[in-house]
Amino acid sequence: MWHRALGPGWKLLLALALTSLQGARGAEEEPSSDGSFQVVTFKWHHVQDPYIIALWILVASLAKIVFHLSHKVTSIVPESALLIVLGLVLGGIVWAADHIASFTLTPTLFFFYLLPPIVLDAGYFMPNRLFFGNLGTILLYAVIGTIWNAATTGLSLYGVFLSGLMGELKIGLLDFLLFGSLIAAVDPVAVLAVFEEVHVNEVLFIIVFGESLLNDAVTVVLYNVFESFVTLGGDAVTGVDCVKGIVSFFVVSLGGTLVGVIFAFLLSLVTRFTKHVRIIEPGFVFVISYLSYLTSEMLSLSSILAITFCGICCQKYVKANISEQSATTVRYTMKMLASGAETIIFMFLGISAVNPDIWTWNTAFVLLTLVFISVYRAIGVVLQTWILNRYRMVQLETIDQVVMSYGGLRGAVAYALVVLLDEKKVKEKNLFVSTTLIVVFFTVIFQGLTIKPLVQWLKVKRSEHREPKLNEKLHGRAFDHILSAIEDISGQIGHNYLRDKWSNFDRKFLSKVLMRRSAQKSRDRILNVFHELNLKDAISYVAEGERRGSLAFIRSPSTDNMVNVDFNTPRPSTVEASVSYFLRENVSAVCLDMQSLEQRRRSIRDTEDMVTHHTLQQYLYKPRQEYKHLYSRHELTPNEDEKQDKEIFHRTMRKRLESFKSAKLGINQNKKAAKLYKRERAQKRRNSSIPNGKLPMENLAHNYTIKEKDLELSEHEEATNYEEISGGIEFLASVTQDVASDSGAGIDNPVFSPDEDLDPSILSRVPPWLSPGETVVPSQRARVQIPNSPSNFRRLTPFRLSNKSVDSFLQADGHEEQLQPAAPESTHM
């Protein structure tokens, strides 16, 4: 199976090797000297580099497909380990074909092209609250823990070397400390690759992953300091140089963070003004973020910290400013680049190892390095956790400490740093490279294989991938305010106090500068919750009737149609429905001309088609159709779903505001609606050409359109957009013939429109399929008991602290029910 599965990859690699040989042999060949015209010429040297890059990307992508063909393999072996093994196999094939290590993971390729998309993806999708809530813990592990691991590993190896167990090596104390500094850092790429498959709880994951990101500053400083000391020589190092090394740590870390924040501010500001160039919005996100990385490298600062904090700080404002299509493009492109870069890194780690020229073996040095990095990692975690648990509210248990100690994975960062060493200054560079590769393979393959069974055996709390309920959000928000108030009253400055102050500062200053005004309104918490409740209630209101079988009764817009609903007719059984559905699916001819269908003699199926057609046309939004738009490089087709959501929201908001106003001022909406209905009816009699001045009552349907003139919009663009949605037509409750109309105003659905005041005798009809305990279905009960509009639903009422509270809204509604006349009244807004 594996031979067949890897066949395409081997064929591509063999073709790559053969073409490389042919290109090497024929690169210097002169063109034909006979002077004749050649129809086809072979120019391998002309496309060699991009062709090889494309082939390697294709091989890496095919490898991911092959690995995931068998879920059993990927559930046991991490994908990073499989990629390293694949790299070893491919590297062996390339070496056997050419005996030259043609393809290796170079530091330039890694640091400038493969690492930035991975770190940007991690920063842009970082859970900010979880990250900053554990920032103190992360910084302690990243700074103190990395220094501890580097110093103890280097000094321990130097002590063993002095004992003579390693034999004769041309290494000094500074060389051992240099090696300890590059091998001590936890690699973010390896941690992401392994821990995302384990699915540990969020706190444990953010601590280990945050440590792997933030220890870059410590690693870079230690590496540069000890490399400079090795260049100067141990005798030339003074105390001033040590002080400069300590100062450089703060400059590198804080400087890289500041560069990232500045570019995040610039990116957020740019995306605020991209309303008319939506198509290039994703380009700004990637280019400006990458510039933050390059700028930090240019200034010798921490580039990983720069691009990480650029993604962390800009995500809130960028997501609010850019369009939905651009946000989707950014999300998928960023994930694609990060996944592809991670795949190439691990595969090239395996390929780079197949090079006999870099291998120098020393058993004592290699084995003791593995022992020391594991032991000192565990000791450092235990000591630091003991200190942290004295101040943390949620303490880290022993099981969490075991996983953190075992999760100290090394990866391509250590390999790239060791390859950068100058062989003239570090005599045993090949020994360091060989040991680093062994450490990377051991941590990624062995620890990656065993960490998942270890987590299951220790019963570590796993992450829950679900959306928190509204009740959980409400209580979490309330607890945040309570804890912030307690800290404020007691005079203590804690996480909740700082978070509350930052939220106020962001709302008053940053959001006004970096975010569009329309985005500020749309991000309002109350309106977001209101919008979610509105959509949920609308969906459940319709679905409730469908489950009960009373959808036709609920959606019937006129009195006559409601009278014509025969509840005594038995409903078809499940078998009949399935047979009917089967026959309908296999019918070849379907009549789509609804006008001719209505005029001719109708069968049962034709009647059903006609009713379904009119129901969908009148009460639901138009389904998506394939429009043929002209090609444009600068514009995208607007998403109709956004208009639908906005229209539902604004229409329901207006009805609830009117309900609130009427309840507060004691205005009887029925009397007001009766006057409006009489005035409209008189106007219709005067203007209509219908004989005797009477309106026909057959097939009546209420058509509603609305123009939101009174809606206060802050910007011209919002008013323009909304006029496009609503159609800009004055609202009139009119009675027209039941024709297949296509109103540009949006929905004309009684579910979202005001209820019709109907004859009580009609509303009192009870469907026969209900049990004695249920007089009417819940959705029908909502129509009958509440006379005015859906805004009187208990869940759709204006915001209250409790469903059980008896406020002015319920009292006003109950008073109106008592005063409602028996005669039906007009439809009103």
From Swiss-Prot:
It is found in: Apical cell membrane; Cell membrane; Recycling endosome membrane; Early endosome membrane. Gene3D superfamilies: 6.10.140.1330. It catalyses: Na(+)(in) + H(+)(out) = Na(+)(out) + H(+)(in). Residues 1-26 form the signal peptide. The modification Phosphoserine is found at residues 550, 558, 588, 603, 659, 714, 805, 808. Residues 587-691 are annotated as: Interaction with AHCYL1. Pfam families: Na_H_Exchanger. Residues 70-77, 125-127, 199-200, 275-276, 319-325, 385-397, 463-829 are cytoplasmic. Coiled coil: none annotated. GO terms for biological process: regulation of pH; sodium ion import across plasma membrane; sodium ion transport. Residues 586-663 are annotated as: Interaction with NHERF4. Disruption phenotype: Deficient mice have diarrhea associated with proximal tubular acidosis and hypotension. Males are infertile. Residues 27-46, 98-106, 164-176, 233-239, 300-301, 355-362, 422-428 are extracellular. It is a multi-pass membrane protein. Seems to switch between active and inactive modes in response to various stimuli. Activated directly or indirectly by membrane phosphatidylinositol (PIs). Regulated by a variety of auxiliary proteins, which facilitate the maturation, cell surface expression and function of the transporter. Inhibited specifically by the drug tenapanor. A 1,2-diacyl-sn-glycero-3-phospho-(1D-myo-inositol) binds at residues 133, 136-137, 393, 492-493, 495. One of its GO terms (molecular function) is identical protein binding. Phosphorylated by PKA, which inhibits activity. Phosphorylation at Ser-659 by SGK1 is associated with increased abundance at the cell membrane. Phosphorylation at Ser-714 by CSNK2A1 regulates SLC9A3 activity through the formation of multiple signaling complexes. Plasma membrane Na(+)/H(+) antiporter. Exchanges intracellular H(+) ions for extracellular Na(+) in 1:1 stoichiometry, playing a key role in salt and fluid absorption and pH homeostasis. Major apical Na(+)/H(+) exchanger in kidney and intestine playing an important role in renal and intestine Na(+) absorption and blood pressure regulation. Homodimer. Found in the forms of complex and dynamic macromolecular complexes. Binds NHERF1 and NHERF2. Interacts with CHP1; this interaction increases trafficking and activity of SLC9A3 at the plasma membrane. Interacts with CHP2 and SHANK2. Interacts with PDZK1 (via C-terminal PDZ domain). Interacts with NHERF4 and interactions decrease in response to elevated calcium ion levels. Interacts with AHCYL1; the interaction is required for SLC9A3 activity. Interacts with EZR; interaction targets SLC9A3 to the apical membrane. Belongs to the monovalent cation:proton antiporter 1 (CPA1) transporter (TC 2.A.36) family. This is Sodium/hydrogen exchanger 3.
